[in-house]
């Protein structure tokens, strides 16, 4: 719907025009607009060509990147791949519509990663299939539905490489994302102490996020990017603190995997947070390794807890050092 809100009106204003799509496209159209237009449908399938005179369009299906009806179109004479949602970014272009007109890494990489991980991230295998499908094409520009147009060899290679990496669920960089939830500030202090100990050990690229204040999409993008994730949260009404529960649920929904995770819970009279987080990462995720013995702090960080935090920092540092970034 974010791409075709004027489609019904267009068909009604111009009754001789045709809507090109696959069978799923037309089913979706009728579901959203409740106005079947079968006389205006032109159904296509994988590999079909439409000649427009000078231009010839070839269809390639990309199911679940990120909707089931998605079809990208390759225009032969210009080498243009109209890639639908693939290779897009969040945000708007600022005058320059081509990535090479900007410092594209600084301008678009963070938002391209956040877009991929939160919109397409669940469908890594489907993205890999799509990349294989278009690998034989002579692509001279990529025109997605969101974000800039990639039109130079450098920018095209850049975004294709990023999608190949992101869809493999492997980290791009050594570093630690610490995601915490805190009701009174005590759990925040635990997160800050762990970050301090990691820094003392030479760990760089430490990101601290309060899951109650930061939109999950930003935390998820960095969790994808860096090798290690730490979740720190208190018990709330015999359950895991709800904003942390929601964050972990978001990670699960996006098929987060192939990373290292460490866990710290906090409780005052009945412990549930630590056990719940351990159960989530052990049972609900694939290829997640829990690094260091999960900790369960009682109410607030005390002097006798510091050695436990130091031990976890040692283990995380060793985990980071042992990993190779490809």
What are these regions (language model features)?
Residues 179-200:
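Short, charged N-terminal beta->alpha structural module
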Residues 1-11:
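Di-metal (Zn2+ and/or Mg2+/Mn2+) metal-binding site signature of metallo-dependent hydrolases
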Residues 6, 214-219:
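Short acidic active-site motifs
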Residues 83, 178-181, 264:
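Short hydrophobic segments within beta-strands
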